[in-house]
Amino acid sequence: TMGIALKYLGYSMNTDDIAALEAAKDLLISQKTQGIVKAYQVDETKDKMIAGEAAMGVMWSGDAQYAITQNPDLAYVIPKEGSNVWVDCMVIPKAAKNKTNAEKFIDFLCRPDIAKLNCEAIGYSSPNAGAIELMGADYQDNPVMNPTDEDVANCDTIHYLSDTLLLIYNALWADVKNAK
């Protein structure tokens, strides 16, 4: 939420500029006190959107894809100011006892036929070229699953926050949550 406010104001989601962070906090508090925002939520947003209890929400693309399948009156957009880009990663710990089986499992998930099934089951896009080909034009032309290069160009990959910056973010967010 803080990141989206930063993008709206023209800043990177990764800024450490205190004035920019304060401006984002002030924007969020203003939205809240004016009644523009019903609630700052994460997982509950898709359910509220599906039920028609909210007019707009910030959510992960997979949640949006699911919500649209449940309520065709919904649409998904990436704000012109941008958003965030994210990925889920698979790792094998150095001390893993079954490294060979872990590698086999990752290889299995990367098979195009399995990656296709996984994508269809979870509603999130796939970087697997073979899976994308198997899913066909409906998937390839879906802007929720495959945003344009122009949309992605305006987006930030969120970087690690230093311990100091994390404390600042937490304090600013507490101000937003406690605003009446």
Give the residues covered by each predicted segment.
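Extracytoplasmic ligand-binding site segments that recognize negatively charged/polar headgroups
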Residues: 1-53
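Sec-exported extracytoplasmic/periplasmic mature domains
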Residues: 6-11, 29-33, 50, 54, ...
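Periplasmic-binding protein-like
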Residues: 3, 27-31, 70-94
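Mature extracytoplasmic/periplasmic domains
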Residues: 84, 93-153
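Short, hydrophobic alpha-helical packing/hinge segments within bilobed ligand-binding/sensory domains
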Residues: 45-48, 64, 102, 115
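Generic hydrophobic alpha-helical scaffold/packing signal
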Residues: 46, 50, 68, 93, ...
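A ligand-binding cleft/hinge motif common to bilobed small-molecule-binding domains
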Residues: 56-73
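Conserved C-terminal helix/tail region of periplasmic/extracytoplasmic solute-binding proteins
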Residues: 47, 149-180
